[in-house]
Amino acid sequence: MKRILLTKAFVLILITLNNSCGVRMGQKKVLASEIEQIKNTFAPDKRTALFNIDVLDGPSGFTLIGETNLPRAIDSLEAVLSEKGIVATNEVNVLPADNLEGMTKAVINISAANLRSNPKHSAELATQATLGTVVNVLKKEGDWYLIQTPDKYLAWVDPGGIQLMNNAEITAWKSSEKIIYTNTYGHAFSSIDAVNRISDIVAGSILKLVGSDESHFKIAFPDGRQAYISKDEAQEYETWLSSLDYTANSLIETSKTLMGVPYLWGGTSTKGVDCSGYTKTIYFLNGMVIPRDASQQVHAGKPVDSIADFSKLEKGDLLFFGRKATDSTAEKVVHVGMWIGDKQFIHSSEMVRISSVDEESPNYDAFNVGRYLRTQRLLNEDDPLLQNLTINQPIKD
């Protein structure tokens, strides 16, 4: 009798444990599903948002681990779990990291900082940021810093590319008077006789204005170095902003100043550009910050054409090229150029050059016409993906 009772008790324990494990497994699946949904909502593009969250299932229950730069996403996840009655310890690291000790801002300190996909020099060149660009610093790994640029792009930079700043320092930098370099490429010198170079400079570089005379600006770099730039090559930032002529013709004029500049994967400076880095640079030099990559730019502005009816296009429109969607594969945008009229577009392919969609033209681009996808209009469009520097100044402020 005693053996029978013990057997029944053992069976009951097994059933209880089984049920408990079943409930736990069910909760873990729900938890994983909710994490995925939150990620899709707040961080659908890993190039611009970080949300790497995992679940540990230990003796004391569920534990959320990982990192993100999206506090609102974590708040949303905790609210959903509470609503569903799932208890989980939150050990997610919300960036910026504590070990930065308040140095969570930085300013690009060289003409064009190379930003990598991973924290090493051999990693892919993800993008570039030009001198004077204010960035957010999220964490440090070895000697490298994970930063986020004004267009929200996430990438790694070595310490030589930035000047770290705390809140007080970045506030002082932002509030100081600035100049913007408007020539395609040049140099800053230690004196007005232009003998000793301090640094090279690319178009769109922004520096602190220290003083000026009839012919030169005296400027300061983010790290405090001082130099001189000819007034023929730069403008006071506020003067430049107020003088911007954000029109199709100004976009075309700017685009042609980069003719022959070499193609560089990840390039967004006048030293070298990839296709989307080129269109991004053209728009920035006319006062507009647009998304970084072609596959992001294609979602900005308003649709114009998707059937190769080039008569609908206006100067300044962006044309996108790539692989069309099929029953088994998604569309893939891989290239972008800007329409300049007369059946022509300008783009960075091997170098910055002009191509035509006209079969009779000597510069007819059969390859790109054959993979044409659609055209978007960004000029004068109201879109949260487009930042107008005359209204919202993410570079300076």
Which residues does each PLM region occupy?
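...with weaker cross-activation on analogous glycine-rich loops/strands in unrelated enzymes
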Residues: 290-354, 360
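N-terminal targeting leaders
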Residues: 8-11, 21-128, 133, 159-165
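Beta-loop motif signature
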Residues: 108-131, 180-209, 263
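SH3/SH3-like beta-barrel superfamily modules
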Residues: 61-63, 67, 74, 126-158, ...
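Boundary regions of SH3-family modules and the immediately adjacent low-complexity/disordered segments
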Residues: 75-99, 149-182, 192-197, 217-254, ...
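Active-site nucleophilic cysteine motif
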Residues: 255, 267-286
